[in-house]
Amino acid sequence: MKKSRDNYTFLTHAPVHRVIFTMAIPTIISMLSTSMYNLADTYFVGSINTQSVAAVGVSFAMMSVIQAVGFLYGHGSGNYISRMLGAKEVEKAKKMASTGFVLSFLTGLLIAILGQLFLTPLCILLGSTPTIQPYAERYLGIILLGAPFMTTSLTLNNQMRFQGNAMYAMKGIMSGVLLNLILAPLLILYFAMGITGA
C-alpha cells in the first residue's frame, strides 16, 4: 500500500520532466529488450541452417500481431487504470485490470486455436515457400501455443507501467529475455532440438 501511495505522490507532485525521464528510460529499455528476444532466436537458429533462419523471419509478422494484441489491451486498460488511480477510484481500476487481463488471455487463446487450425495456410500467407514450410510450421506452431501467455504478460507489463511501476515492468521483460538467452542455445545446440528449441 505504501508503494502505491509513493507512486501517487511522485506522479502527481514531482516535476513533469523528472516523471517523464523516470518512466521513459525503463520503457525504452523494455522495448529494446523485446527486440533482443527475436534477435537472439535468429542468431542461434542461424547455426542450424538457412531454412530455419527464414522460418524465424516468416514468423516475425505473427509475433508482431501477438505483441500488438498485448499492447492493445495493456494500453487501453492501463490508460483507464491510471486515470482511476489518479481519481482515487481504486475499485474501478482493479475491475479494469481484471477485464484487460481476461480479454487479453481470451484473444491470445483465440489466436492460438485459429493459428493451429490454419497453420499451413497461415505460413503460406506470411510468405513461406515449400522449402521452409516444415520449419516455419514447427517454429510458428510453438509460438502460437504461447500466444495467450505472451498477450497477457504484455498486457500486465503495460498495466504496471501505467501505474507508475515502469521499473518492475522493465525487470519482468528483461528476465524473460535473459531466460531466452540462456535456454535458446541450450535447447537448440546442446540438446540438438533445432528450431523447436528456439
Segments and roles (model prediction):
Residues 1-24, 81-148, 179-182, 186-198:
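Short alpha-helical transmembrane segments in multi-pass integral membrane proteins
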Residues 27, 31, 43, 60, ...:
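Transmembrane alpha-helix boundary and packing residues in multipass membrane permease domains
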Residues 32, 36-54, 123-130, 186-193:
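Helix-terminus/linker motif at the lipid-water interface of multi-pass membrane proteins
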Residues 170-172, 197:
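Hydrophobic alpha-helical membrane segments of integral membrane proteins
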